[in-house]
Design a protein with these regions (language model features):
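Acidic, proline/glycine-rich short linear motifs
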Residues: 34-69, 102, 151-166
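Small/aliphatic-rich secondary-structure junction motif
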Residues: 2-55, 83-86, 165-166
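Short, flexible loop segments at boundaries between secondary-structure elements
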Residues: 140-152
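Structural beta-alpha unit
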Residues: 76-112, 152-153, 161-166
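Solvent-exposed polar/charged
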Residues: 22, 105-106, 136
């Protein structure tokens, strides 16, 4: 079985790797870091902040190098967690979530593992609604691991296993 783990270096994505390792120790995993091309990021920025076209290629190469290192860091964490991990780094095709879904299809992942949210702003690799969109578009099982501090958000004195609405 091959699993796909979305990784952006955030605490949420680190928690997703750790949980996948606990649950699926010894399984094969592809640790995917998705990055946004500078041209796409600039197009989303205000027109006054756009870079010269020739700078974008240089910036993309630098970003890709950093993202490859980040993917390798994620794969190292996955190996430490007991998974047989391979790093992978892809630029987003349309949106981060669609790249995750596309890669899962390409590698025939039996499961996609992601955190609940990643970094925001320019460093965003797993946007706030990315895990939700992956869940609804993947066509395969998706494991969404809550943030490490989600336990502190629990309602005190609730019965174990009880859901609470606040």
């Amino acid at each position: 079985m091959t699993i796909l783990i979305a990784y952006d270096g955030s605490d949420d994505s680190k928690a997703a790797i750790a949980f996948a390792g606990e649950l699926l120790k010894g399984e094969s995993a592809v640790v995917l870091t998705v990055w946004e091309r500078a041209a796409m990021a600039s197009a989303r920025a205000s027109v006054g902040l756009m870079m010269a076209i020739d700078q974008l290629g240089t910036e993309d190469a630098a970003i890709e190098g950093a993202m490859r290192e980040l993917a390798e860091q994620g794969a190292d964490l996955a190996r430490q967690a007991g998974l047989v991990a391979t790093p992978r780094c892809d630029p987003d095709s349309v949106a981060v979530w669609s790249t995750i879904v596309d890669v899962a299809e390409e590698i025939d992942a039996r499961l996609i593992v992601t955190g609940t949210r990643g970094f925001g702003g320019v460093r965003s690799l797993l946007l706030g609604s990315t895990s939700d969109r992956v869940l609804h578009h993947a066509g395969r099982p998706v494991l969404i691991v809550p943030a490490p501090d989600a336990a502190s958000d629990a309602v005190p004195d609730a019965e174990p296993g009880a859901d609470a609405v606040t």
